[in-house]
């Protein structure tokens, strides 16, 4: 039976949330547009019956373990760190309490393409001063984490430690069933409970409200001399009729408990939700993988950053000691001079775009280093961000793309030229090959060198990601075909129109991106000068445009490709042509 002593008690709690410290300017901009909407909805929210929470599907996988139930606690404990085992000397530990959205799978290693954000949380904390320990486990609710896993974590707590509690996706479930027995009562009332026989544990059991369990965590964290942080849940891949990410009702409940208990609250649901709302639908979708709740590495990284930003930019005085242990929260950006107010043309590519580029004009040269010879630098700033050995995948994974993306402003241009390093062994230690296709396809591979798992996408997919990101920032992407190689089958220079050329065309057809065919413009130039009956003689004559091998160019070859870019821009009457000399 459900017992309530103060039926109307919950109606008035949200006024307390007005005193929860708001985030600094960045977070204020994201949150305030939702704030008054939440106040208006609050009265009705509390009096709704059962909410539609996440009753997660049962995923498959090689592990043969059901990720959304605690049916393999023994196996999970072999992969989760023993509570407190990551502590270094007398340093504090930041414990993460959550479910599969924080730690996916019993191993949490991404072998199913899904990642929990807790895996990436340590990126934002100084490991010399604090350990980040992910104690989350798939399938846990606020209640059964507290009953099954929390006691061991509680014993490991020491004064000065920190605990983030962000849990609730699995709370709308049966109370006493044989398989899970993990449900909790909606809301925050302390005096609401239900009793029954727990078939999973074979004992009489009592179930309390969501708010009750949060208070239990807070009380016991304080008893240990540690610091509690309540955090709302990461958003789902679910949208309202305006196409915006649906916000979770637990946000209001956690905010109330935090306010009344006097602990910091970080609205992860809103911070990440606002970011996702600013993306294209295509981009929103690839932040999730396999279902509507679990995230890809993209989504997990986004949520880890949002959690870090929520802590770092909070004005809550209790968080100041933790803020002093944080790193990498500010966006990584390209150091480009904006003082003139001129637009910037960013160039992204590989060693054919940026190479040794020696002052004496010897050795290998990339054409991007000569872009200033074709652009009028009194009108536009040239920023060559290409780097040797990069493919689309590696340029992204190395963080090079993130710096360009974070630096973009409306009116900028981005030249994208990849291909030479993109096709090869997908799992070797170079970690740069992509699926040879332009389709939106991906697959999980295990990398041979270190055994890690990575969800690898197609050549076309990575290009489409770059294109979409550039447009999101109000800048203009321009796709460039790869430079030609010094190969002369049948006495004419090699054309790669049936592989890369086809993939470029498919990306163009799908995205409508602007395109300059440097490959064929430069190839036409070389054919006109050197084509003949003897392939070897053709190659020898053309060698003056190349250096070291058949791919990399000399200073003269780099000049040729830079001129091909300018020619292509003029032929297409592209707006960027207005910035040429």
Regions found by a protein language model. Name each.
Residues 141-152, 391-403:
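N-terminal post-signal-peptidase region of extra-cytosolic proteins
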Residues 152-297, 301, 308-323, 403-552, ...:
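Alpha-helical cap/lid subdomain in secreted, periplasmic
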Residues 134-139, 201-203, 350, 382-390, ...:
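Short, basic, glycine/proline-bearing loop/turn elements
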Residues 106-110, 241-245, 357-361, 395-396, ...:
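Short, solvent-exposed loop/turn segments at secondary-structure boundaries
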Residues 52-136, 151-163, 179-188, 332-386, ...:
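Serine-esterase "nucleophile elbow" of acetyl-processing enzymes
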Residues 323-335, 580-581:
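Acidic two-metal-ion nuclease catalytic site recognized across multiple nuclease folds
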Residues 102, 137-142, 170, 353, ...:
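Short active-site-proximal "capping" loops at secondary-structure junctions
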Residues 1-7, 12-52:
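Bacterial Sec-dependent N-terminal signal peptides
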């Amino acid at each position: 039976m459900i017992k309530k002593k103060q039926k109307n008690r919950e109606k008035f709690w949200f006024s307390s949330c007005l005193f929860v410290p708001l985030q600094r300017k960045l977070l204020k901009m994201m949150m305030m547009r939702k704030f008054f909407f939440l106040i208006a909805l609050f009265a009705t929210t509390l009096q709704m019956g059962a909410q539609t929470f996440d009753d997660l599907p049962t995923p498959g996988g090689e592990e043969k373990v059901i990720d959304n139930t605690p049916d393999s606690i023994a196996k999970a404990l072999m992969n989760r760190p023993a509570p407190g085992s990551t502590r270094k000397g007398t340093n504090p530990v930041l414990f993460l309490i959550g479910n599969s959205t924080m730690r996916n799978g019993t191993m949490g290693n991404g072998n199913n393409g899904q990642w929990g954000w807790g895996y990436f949380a340590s990126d934002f904390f100084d490991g010399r001063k604090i350990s980040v320990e992910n104690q989350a486990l798939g399938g846990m609710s606020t209640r059964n984490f507290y009953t099954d896993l929390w006691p061991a974590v509680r014993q490991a707590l020491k004064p000065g430690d920190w605990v983030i509690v962000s849990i609730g996706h699995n709370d709308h479930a049966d109370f006493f069933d044989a398989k899970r027995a993990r449900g909790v009562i909606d809301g925050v009332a302390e005096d609401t409970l239900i009793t029954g026989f727990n078939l999973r544990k074979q004992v009489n059991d009592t179930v309390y409200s969501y708010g009750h369990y949060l208070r239990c965590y807070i009380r016991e964290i304080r008893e240990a001399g540690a610091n509690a942080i309540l955090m709302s849940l990461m958003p789902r891949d679910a949208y309202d009729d305006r196409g915006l990410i649906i916000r979770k009702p637990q946000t209001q409940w956690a905010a109330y408990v935090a306010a009344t208990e006097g602990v910091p609250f970080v609205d992860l649901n809103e911070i990440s939700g606002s970011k996702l709302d600013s993306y294209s639908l295509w981009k929103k979708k690839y932040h999730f993988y396999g279902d509507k709740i679990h995230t890809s590495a993209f989504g997990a990284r986004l949520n880890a950053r949002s959690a870090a930003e929520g802590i770092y930019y909070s004005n809550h005085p209790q968080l100041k000691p933790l803020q002093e242990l944080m790193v990498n929260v500010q966006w990584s950006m390209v150091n480009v001079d904006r003082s003139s107010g001129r637009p910037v043309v960013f160039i992204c590519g590989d060693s054919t775009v940026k190479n040794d580029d020696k002052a004496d004009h010897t050795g290998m040269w990339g054409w991007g280093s000569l872009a200033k010879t074709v652009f009028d630098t009194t009108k536009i700033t040239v920023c060559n961000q290409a780097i040797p050995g990069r493919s689309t995948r590696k340029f992204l994974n190395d963080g090079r793309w993130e710096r360009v993306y974070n630096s973009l402003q409306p009116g900028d241009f981005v030249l994208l030229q990849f291909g030479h390093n993109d096709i090869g062994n997908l799992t070797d230690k170079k970690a740069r090959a992509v699926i040879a296709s332009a389709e939106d396809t991906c697959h999980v591979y295990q990398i041979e060198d270190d055994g890690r798992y990575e969800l690898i996408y197609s050549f076309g997919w990575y290009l489409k990601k770059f294109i979409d990101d550039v447009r999101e920032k109000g800048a203009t992407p321009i796709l460039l075909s790869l430079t030609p190689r010094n190969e002369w089958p049948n006495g004419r220079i090699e054309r790669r129109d049936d592989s890369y050329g086809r993939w470029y065309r498919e990306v163009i057809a799908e995205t409508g991106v602007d395109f300059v065919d440097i490959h064929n413009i430069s190839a036409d130039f070389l054919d006109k000068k050197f084509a003949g009956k003897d392939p070897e003689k053709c190659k020898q004559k053309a060698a003056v445009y190349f250096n070291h091998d058949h791919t990399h160019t000399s200073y003269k070859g780099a000049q040729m490709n830079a001129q091909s870019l300018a020619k292509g821009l003029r032929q297409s009457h592209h707006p960027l042509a207005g910035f040429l000399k």
